[in-house]
């Protein structure tokens, strides 16, 4: 369990292998910082995108000027946000495409954010490169943000690079 000191706190992750943390005091002033080297088969200039689709939506890299976001924030409430099976089942309509219909075929990784309106889970997603969809075996839970609704998460809550 992690708690901040009030004000703005930074929670640091160097990779997807550190295990799942429970952050008890995450707030709008706080930052999740990742030193992980995300794949870059596409431009990664877009830090975060919000998806309000009931089970995720199709993300079209072509309509995003060739950019693949590092963070996908899913704001529809997911009662099973804390299990990999619950997340992969919930995101049944989400997939990453190059043009709206052609699934990506390269290995990509990203952060997936999903919650139930009260708590939020942060997942590392390492797409196998076969279809651009989220599979249970491709997910690693990084953190649970207790009493934080991801609907209010913005790019200011996420940073990249070393400490």
Each model region followed by its residue ranges:
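Acidic, glycine-rich calcium-binding repeat modules characteristic of RTX/beta-roll
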Residues: 1-68
């Amino acid at each position: 369990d992690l708690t901040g000191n009030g004000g703005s706190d930074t929670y640091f992750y160097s990779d997807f292998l550190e295990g799942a943390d429970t952050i008890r005091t995450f707030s709008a002033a706080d930052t999740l910082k990742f030193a992980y080297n995300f794949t870059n088969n596409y431009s990664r200039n877009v830090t975060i995108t919000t998806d309000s689709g009931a089970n995720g939506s199709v993300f079209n890299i072509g309509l995003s000027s060739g950019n693949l976001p590092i963070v996908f924030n899913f704001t529809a409430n997911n009662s099973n946000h804390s299990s990999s099976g619950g997340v992969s089942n919930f995101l049944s309509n989400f997939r990453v495409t190059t043009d709206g219909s052609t699934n990506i075929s390269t290995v990509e990784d990203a952060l997936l954010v999903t919650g139930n309106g009260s708590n939020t889970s942060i997942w590392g997603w390492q797409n196998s490169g076969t279809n651009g969809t989220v599979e249970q075996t491709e997910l690693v839970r990084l953190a649970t943000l207790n009493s934080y609704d991801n609907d209010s998460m913005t790019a200011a809550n996420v940073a990249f690079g070393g400490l």
